[in-house]
Amino acid sequence: MAEVLKKVDVVTVGAGWTGGIVAAELTKAGLNVLSLERGHMQSTENFNYIHDEWRYGINYGLMQDCSKDTVTFRHDPSGLALPYRKMGSFLLGNNVGGAGVHWNGWTFRFMPYDFEIQTLSKQRYGNKLGNDYTLQDWGVTYKDMEPYYDRFEKTCGVSGEPNPLAEKMGAFRSSPYPQEPLENTKMLKRFESAAKSSNLHTYRLPASNSKGGYTNPDGQDLAPCQYCAYCERFGCEYGAKASPLNTVIPKAMSTGKYTIRTYSNVTQILKKDGKVTGVKFVDTRTMKEYIQPADIVVLASYMFNNAKLLMVSNIGEQYDPKTGKGTLGRNYCYQMNMGTTAFFDEQFNTFMGSGALGTTSDDFNGDNFDHSKEKFLHGAMIYSVQLGTRPIQSAPLPAGAPTWGAEFKKALNYNFTRAITVGGQGASLPHKNNYLSLDPTYKDAFGMPLLRLTYNFTDQDRALHKFITDKTAEVAKRMQGVKSIKKGAYLKDYSVVPYQSTHNTGGTTMGADRETSVVNTYLQHWDADNLFVVGAGNFQHNSGYNPTDTVGALAYRCTEGILKYHKSGKSLA
């Protein structure tokens, strides 16, 4: 028999970026908030010995235990899905702070085109992709989202500079970035020169890695980045990379109205008479069940888990690819990476770096170029970054290099700091056969069905990937002093084995119409107005940018909706 705990104003499932933002804003407004986190407590002090590439970079010390909960995967609706038991394609964060601890800090706003992609694409190109692609407007515009982007970027102390194509895209800013860009480097200047000679308009990556000492509007301090090269897959021991642990969570804690209960795995959302009443969870140390009543429930865990909890709790209609009916699980999207590596006799100090130390361009991103003769929509940014080459994970070798023995070692040593990659990150558009559902066979450690991922790259993806890959090769060839280039392979079937990105989106999409979305534009569930679902699952597609800035902006907008609902008790749609 589950023990019933004292009721709270708001309970969040998860204590990462979204849960932390919700907690900070609601506790400042006087509400009592409890976050249920299935991992353990951690803080900046836990990362003093984080420079262990084997433990964290290779064996994923900050990530979810796939033996207890994971997803199953198949390529198409007729296939057999099997469990994802070792982290590969994407890395699911664990513990307080979630993926916001091990991210790199790339902090891009989505384009105005992204939020109205169905309408704007149809106006310019008609039904170019056909009916199998389920493009959908988000129900908000860039203008609606801009104030929330501004808030998140000031929370993170973003270091950046204006995008030279911002005016063309209609991507205005109400204020400049809080800090100047990170240091420029010899390597990045080499890329910038080649990109400009290719008629690309370059700018520095917006980085949630602090250029200098910074105090955000909530009074939380960020230290200057040390360019130590241990950002992605690692926590920041300097407190220079913005994360929930050094921004929103301590702010929420300072109010005295916020509690985090760790080792608490939520298994069900409870409901009665059209409302949710709280959640059921298991203490993972004792396996004892508890019921946490709440006036408002906020799903703020990773997008896979948010979708799974709605499904196992029978809230919303499961998407059916055969009929096209239902919205829960619909429009799962990912991203594509492509690129070309250039090799030099000249050395670059690539052993130093930062998570978002880079230069990029948007000339072939979004709808910034004419797609009339192309077999795809949207695009990708073309960039180069100096994250820091680490000895185990970094092994750049030119074509034809030995792959074994003394000559292999010699080639590894020589090329370690003599390579520059020109990369691309491509948008992912929704397809009717890419979706999330519950697996009928496999269960997690608590007896609940695993979430099933049905996904493969599409003809749209392959055409975009080839186009951008060729563009990266053109830029790489133009770099001064280049000796040879190695162009990446064109896209094949999706594989969950090699790492690609932790930019999973969709499944709990937002919109202005309940027939095409799970939540409204304040992320309030259509079927239960005291339930809010926030995260990258709200995206109707994925852009050519990283998702975190948009996730943070949506979380700030969601908190406004929660406060409005708390006062009125009514739907916000």
Predicted feature residues:
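Conserved N-terminal glycine-rich FAD pyrophosphate-binding loop of Rossmann-like flavoproteins
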Residues: 40-63, 93-95, 99-105
